[in-house]
Amino acid sequence: MKQALRVAFGFLILWASVLHAEVRIVIDSGVDSGRPIGVVPFQWAGPGAAPEDIGGIVAADLRNSGKFNPLDRARLPQQPGSAQEVQPSAWSALGIDAVVVGQVTPNPDGSYNVAYQLVDTGGAPGTVLAQNSYKVNKQWLRYAGHTASDEVFEKLTGIKGAFRTRIAYVVQTNGGQFPYELRVSDYDGYNQFVVHRSPQPLMSPAWSPDGSKLAYVTFESGRSALVIQTLANGAVRQVASFPRHNGAPAFSPDGSKLAFALSKTGSLNLYVMDLASGQIRQVTDGRSNNTEPTWFPDSQNLAFTSDQAGRPQVYKVNINGGAPQRITWEGSQNQDADVSSDGKFMVMVSSNGGQQHIAKQDLATGGVQVLSSTFLDETPSLAPNGTMVIYSSSQGMGSVLNLVSTDGRFKARLPATDGQVKFPAWSPYL
């Protein structure tokens, strides 16, 4: 917990720009198919009202994962304050085999102790599957709740939780001197802040693998440019500003390289920069357009979009040489892929029969599953644990963010109140 707090501390310097017009998750479908679980309001040991509803945060996280269906508070058979107070029969009668209880205690120095216990209702009374406690300041209470959620999620599913992650996205506001904003928020839309404001369009944010930097495209110089911004201090490094197009940045998983697309020689082609030396080398060549690179876990291979066969399709290429190999064959066109961190599958924008949706492709079998059902879906980005996808879609005259689970069952929206939202990018583990 302490190490995670140190990593996240770099964001505090930007909290002066925290916005009130935040996005929030609105669930559309799929939660009913999740595993039932009980999450009891955490017991508050201080005067007055608790400063944060930690139990509510844990319940929302588990619900937002699409894998759990927390029992509504009005239906809780009891509200135990500790593992010893849980009555297994009361919960098992409702089909619930796991219950989360917890406590929040204020300390004399102004900090808080947050503790939780995950109780097995199928075992002897008081059987604890997992437990932990954290000492945090007030501004880190939500983070402590997300930490508890991560641990509960991993214990029950075997999958690392991703509730302490963030999302970056571009908002086009309604007028003003700087109508384009690059923003970052917690994965659930809370604690939103502005990274950069611009009078000209901003595009394609991409996270560094340690979560400390964002690469993105800006047009503030009068033409497109690729920059990398350090979140802790706002420092900006210009990576590329060649004639014509500079776009689609993607950090390698090992953090040593940045892939992007340039059209300085005419057609769009892929290039890779060694971030330590600044040396750039060309990866693809030819008269076709090659863009939207995404890395495989080995930091040596890229998936990318190319129209070399006529319509856009996804190809794979080794950055050290060799001919690209086409890897998508279903649908009239496929583009803008994002490869999972384990390299087993990718998500992409797939078009067929006049529809444009987010699809998942198994990279071993080639099997494709359409995940989304929204309109004109774009720019999918995977959560680091591979369980969820965030993407943008058209709604009315604007664009919004959406979530869909990689099994296609759970669907949700993150509506914004102050502009169109595009180019979402899910952070690595923080």
Curated annotation (Swiss-Prot):
Top-level division of the source organism's lineage: Bacteria
InterPro entries xref list: 6-blade_b-propeller_TolB-like (IPR011042), PD40 (IPR011659), Tol-Pal_TolB (IPR014167), TolB_N (IPR007195)
Signal peptide span: 1-21
UniProtKB keywords: Cell cycle, Cell division, Periplasm, Signal
Keyword set includes Signal: yes
Similarity comment text for this entry: Belongs to the TolB family.
Function: Part of the Tol-Pal system, which plays a role in outer membrane invagination during cell division and is important for maintaining outer membrane integrity. TolB occupies a key intermediary position in the Tol-Pal system because it communicates directly with both membrane-embedded components, Pal in the outer membrane and TolA in the inner membrane.
Protein known as: Tol-Pal system protein TolB
Gene of this entry: tolB
